[in-house]
């Protein structure tokens, strides 16, 4: 999702998704920054399993929803926030706006994918990759480490979307590994190399690499899988590859959900979180067009092909990924936002 500027007009966010309202029971409001189709499938299945609970879905970019929840404060109609990336949840946690997730729900997923203090639960995972077009660049000629993207030999060959919230964890990892000065130099070099290939979103990066308009780019893996599913393997000459094991460009981040402290339907909201990490909820994620990794044990996906447990990402935990604010500040400093 793209970093957006929050305005009061977003307070009028219209409800979408979910099933038609049913009579009786309780209605919880879900603020969702996750993929609409997957969210709708999860909500529909949850409502069938919980006939006394209706879910009203309000979808928008996660950063916009973050700002909206903060602006609404104790008056927020949101009961649950479902994000694409952990920094959005960490931001609300830091603001003290999230309630504790039930211990039984947290026990369903590995603790490394959850809030370190139990304020939100991890639901699915994604990993940063390079997408490349072998018609323009051979795999052996690709950078294997994130800092190499600033090498002048890649000028006009690399694309990325600096406004995507998916890119913030990568910057945070580079900051952790190399410090601010080196990260600033890297971003300026990457900016110079991307030139006309600084894109508004990862969909554009994915499409243009696939069409042969630019050699390679940085995305999360699911964008490529989603494109291939939409247009077919025969129309997808592009490929994806990982950075070197444990390089800070190789970042695993999680999508998660939390209950708002201001929720007036906490019991029903907690039930929804429990469903997200249940076998049924995780199977929906495993077979959805989101192409993310389910994180509950015993649930696997055919796509992505590399199993979650075989990934070798940079060793950074969710607390260290933080709220993403340092990454945003640095992007603004180098005028990429």
Enumerate the predicted regions with their spans.
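An extracytoplasmic/periplasmic, membrane-proximal ligand-sensing/linker region
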Residues: 181-183, 290-337
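Periplasmic-binding protein-like
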Residues: 126, 156-162, 188-191, 196-199, 234-261, 275-299
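A bilobed periplasmic-binding-protein/Venus flytrap-type ligand-binding module shared by bacterial periplasmic
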Residues: 131-136, 252-265, 284, 288
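Short amphipathic alpha-helical coupling segments at ligand-binding clamshell hinges
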Residues: 42, 186, 220, 255, ...
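C-terminal motif of bacterial Sec signal peptides marking the signal peptidase cleavage site
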Residues: 12-15
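Extracytoplasmic ligand-binding site segments that recognize negatively charged/polar headgroups
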Residues: 32-40, 63, 76-214, 224, ...
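Early extracytoplasmic/lumenal segment of secretory-pathway proteins
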Residues: 17, 22-90, 337
């Amino acid at each position: 999702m793209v970093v957006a500027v929050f305005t009061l007009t977003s307070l009028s966010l219209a409800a979408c998704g979910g099933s038609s309202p049913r009579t009786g029971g309780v209605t919880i409001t879900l603020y969702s920054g996750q993929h609409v189709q997957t969210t709708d499938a999860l909500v529909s299945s949850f409502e069938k399993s919980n006939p006394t609970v209706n879910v009203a879905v309000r979808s928008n970019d996660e950063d916009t929803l973050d700002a909206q929840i903060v602006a609404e404060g104790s008056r927020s109609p949101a009961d649950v926030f479902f994000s694409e990336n952990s920094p959005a949840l960490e931001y609300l946690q830091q603001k003290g706006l999230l309630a504790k997730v039930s211990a039984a729900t947290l026990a369903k997923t590995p603790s490394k994918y959850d809030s370190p203090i139990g304020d939100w639960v991890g639901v699915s995972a994604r990993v940063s990759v390079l997408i490349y077009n072998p018609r323009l660049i051979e795999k052996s000629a690709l950078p294997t480490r994130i800092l190499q993207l600033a090498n002048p030999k890649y000028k006009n060959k690399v694309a990325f979307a600096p406004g995507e919230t998916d890119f913030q964890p990568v910057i945070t990892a580079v900051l952790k590994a190399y410090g601010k000065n080196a990260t600033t130099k890297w971003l300026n070099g990457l900016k110079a190399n991307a030139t006309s290939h600084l894109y508004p979103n990862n969909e554009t990066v994915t499409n243009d690499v696939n069409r042969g308009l630019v050699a390679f780019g940085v995305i999360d893996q699911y964008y490529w899988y989603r494109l291939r599913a939409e247009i077919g393997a025969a129309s997808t000459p592009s490929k994806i590859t990982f950075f070197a094991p444990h390089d800070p460009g190789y970042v695993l981040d999680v999508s998660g959900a939390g209950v708002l402290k201001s929720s007036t339907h906490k019991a029903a909201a907690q039930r929804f979180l429990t469903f997200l990490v249940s076998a049924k909820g995780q199977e929906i994620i495993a077979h959805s067009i989101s192409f993310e990794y389910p994180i509950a044990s015993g649930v696997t996906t055919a796509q992505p092909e590399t199993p979650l447990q075989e990934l070798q990402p940079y060793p950074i935990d969710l607390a260290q990924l933080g709220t993403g604010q340092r990454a945003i500040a640095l992007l603004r400093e180098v005028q990429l936002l």
